[in-house]
Amino acid sequence: MKRERNNSLDPLEISEWRWSEFLDDAIKALELFDIEPYPIPEEFLTKEETIKFKNNQIKVKALTWACRTTKIRQARAACIEAGPAASVLNLVINPFHNFELPFFGADFVTLPSGHLLALDLQPVLKKDEIHNQKVWSKLIPIHDHWQSLLPSGGPIPQEAETFFSPGFLWTRLPLDDQGSKLISKVIRPAFQEYLTLYIDLISDAQEVSKERSLEILSGQKAYINYRAEKDPARGMLARFFGKDWTEQYIHKVLFDL
């Protein structure tokens, strides 16, 4: 019997979803803190449709898991399963602006053309040494190890560079056994190591001054506004669930600051 989801912490039921173990890793890590549900409107907790794909009817499903803590404003996972059309985990952890913390970002996308996989602790104030020094000194060695085992994902848009750190792990992998092996043997342990570092940063974070928190908030808003405007999943989501639902999901859930 299918269970209804009443809040954003309720379990997700997605049959044969490629990224389930990654989400389990994230939830387990976040449960080290006292988490509570993040308020997600009911229409975005679970969404199902049937669409036409290559002359076949397929079911597509979108589910949202989200929480908050005393230091995390919103940690949310957007989970999409569309069989041969797409399989997606987009995880963003957004800290409160009164802590000197980056964003955590993981974007794992499987499409008919291959896997697009990105992972980073994204700076709020990229040109600010105080904001980045402690993070990058620990992140870059982790990145360099795992990125050396993966092909490069290619260049990123110049306008987006300000929102990525030198520890941005980015790769494209084929839809074959080798790609699946790299996801299991490289991407997942890299994800776990990035996540462990981020959880440690949260644990150690102390409140900053009001003046500093306003600088951080300004940087967070710049990132959130950019992501909402340029979200590369917009077209896919609109094809699956319609333009109106997609725009509301992007602005009310995914990037709601």
From Swiss-Prot:
EC number(s) reported in the record: 1.3.7.3
Catalytic activity annotation: (3Z)-phycoerythrobilin + oxidized 2[4Fe-4S]-[ferredoxin] = 15,16-dihydrobiliverdin + reduced 2[4Fe-4S]-[ferredoxin] + 2 H(+)
A GO term for molecular function: phycoerythrobilin:ferredoxin oxidoreductase activity
InterPro entries listed in its UniProt record: Ferredoxin-dep_bilin_Rdtase, Phycoerythrobilin_Fdx_Rdtase
GO biological-process terms attached to the record: phytochromobilin biosynthetic process
Statement: the UniProt record of this protein carries the keyword Acetylation: no
Keywords from the UniProt entry: Oxidoreductase
EC class name: oxidoreductase
Family: Belongs to the HY2 family.
Job description of the protein: Catalyzes the two-electron reduction of the C2 and C3(1) diene system of 15,16-dihydrobiliverdin.
Name under which the protein is recorded: Phycoerythrobilin:ferredoxin oxidoreductase
